[in-house]
């Protein structure tokens, strides 16, 4: 028998420090990781002029690659449905 590992998509949270909505989204993602397989990458938009211009104060944004999944608030049902396609 092989030891196959399931693919775990990496979800990116575009965030900045001192952003309470960002902190809430990240905490919610950590809770979902208890039952769903995915990795989280947090990107501080203030470290990139391009990202700061793109998002400004319109954060947090949750994305998988170029696909935006949620903006401002985590949508657990929509994210669960999206991630079910990777099982």
Range-by-range predicted roles:
Residues 71-75:
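N-terminal, polar/charged subdomain of small-to-medium soluble alpha/beta proteins
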Residues 33-37:
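Short helix-capping segments at alpha-helix termini
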Residues 59-68:
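A short, hydrophobic beta-strand/beta-hairpin element that forms part of a small beta-sheet core
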Residues 47-60:
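Short Fe-S-cluster ligation motifs
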Residues 38-49:
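Thiol-based oxidoreductase modules, predominantly thioredoxin-like and allied folds used
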Residues 78-87:
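Thiol-/selenol-based redox modules, centered on thioredoxin-like
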Residues 2-31:
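Local sequence-structure signature of Cys/Sec-based thiol-disulfide redox active-site neighborhoods
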């Amino acid at each position: 028998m092989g030891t196959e590992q399931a693919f775990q998509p990496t979800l990116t949270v575009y965030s900045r420090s001192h952003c309470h909505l960002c902190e809430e989204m990240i905490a919610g993602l950590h809770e979902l990781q208890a039952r769903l397989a995915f990795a989280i990458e947090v990107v501080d938009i203030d470290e990139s002029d391009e990202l700061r211009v793109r998002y400004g104060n319109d954060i947090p944004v949750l994305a998988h690659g170029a696909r935006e999944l949620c903006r401002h608030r985590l949508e657990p049902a929509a994210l669960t449905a999206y991630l079910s396609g990777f099982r």
